[in-house]
Amino acid sequence: IIDQCVAQGVPFAREYGGLLDNRSFGGAQVSRTFYARGQTGQQLLLGAYSALSRQIGLGKVKMYTRHEMLDVVKVDGRARGIIARNLITGKIERFAAHAVVVATGGYVNTFFLSTNAMASNGSAAWQCYKKGAYFANPCMVQIHPTCVPVKGDFQSKLTLMSESLRNDGRIWVPKKLEDAKALQAGTKKGKDIPEADRDYYLERRYPAFGNLVPRGVASRAAKERC
């Protein structure tokens, strides 16, 4: 998979000798993660988009933008196409196929807060489920523990912060309640809290992993304190 991504143009970080570099990541105790600075996910998307654009240019793929799937068409118990709506004209369109591949991403926006795209709302998964597709492990939803909270009228969702932040930095909360209240009120800044009054709770509770515990563990621990 990594070689395929490199062939598509994903600029993974490299060592001075030219070999692909590795770093530590959440849930792992050894450096085994390929990365592209702090933008690995974005660069993977750009590489995939570039490969798709090439196939479109060669005439092998036809892309329909601004379309929303409304239903799956079944013929003799098999998925043979979809019904979609053109979001520009509002016209209902149908697409026949020998097979239907559902690659709509997650459905995290069924929750109140999410870093995912606003279109990841679970509608595609629900349409497939209604037509008989198996639905396994709905509780296993990927979340991202490091993000910028929604603030103001111009931020529609949480803004994702690279997980490399936990690799390069340290996470802490004030030990004293009065310091936490002062931070919330804006009367004190984090840099004003002395080191002795900071609780590096992930490092304290999970010394083997420290700040690089798995996402679910980091999120639950943060929820307990915030």
What do these predicted regions represent?
Residues 1-11, 130-136, 141:
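Conserved FAD-binding subdomain of flavin-dependent enzymes
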Residues 4-91, 103, 147-162:
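Conserved redox-cofactor binding core of oxidoreductases
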Residues 34-42, 114, 118, 161, ...:
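Hydrophobic alpha-helical scaffolding
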Residues 90, 107-109, 142:
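Glycine-rich nucleotide phosphate-binding loop and flanking beta-alpha elements
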Residues 118-132:
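Gly/Ser/Thr-rich active-site loops/lids in small-molecule metabolic enzymes
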Residues 127, 133-226:
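An anion/pyrophosphate-binding glycine-rich loop and adjacent beta-alpha core
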